[in-house]
């Protein structure tokens, strides 16, 4: 399997989901967010938190610095806000972009906190290390 696809594929796929959703004038299934204080920002936080979590694979598999991953997420969020300026019924908001940025950072932090310390191959972690002197 192509290593670049393994490292960046999940983030690219999720970025595609975000692009698709922001292409819609009204995102289905989100009307409940209208009744939640700052529900729109919560939606951005969750979507971009998932992007941050998928970007964390690059940190784990290629040692990409966190600052670079946050920058990638921030630039994607800015491009998504610009993209929304062409979608009827959508508008550009700096506050949405800030929610995107915070979401990426929180997603990276959560992925690091809960998954970075664990081995990627759970079977390998169950294999006991060889004993000294044993052949």
Task: Name each model-derived stretch.
Residues 1-57:
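"…centered on the first transmembrane helix and the immediately adjacent amphipathic helix/loop
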Residues 58-80, 84:
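Membrane-embedded catalytic cores of phosphoryl/pyrophosphoryl-handling enzymes
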Residues 59-63, 83, 87, 91, ...:
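Membrane-interfacial segments
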Residues 120-135:
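Short, intrinsically disordered terminal tails adjacent to the first/last structured region
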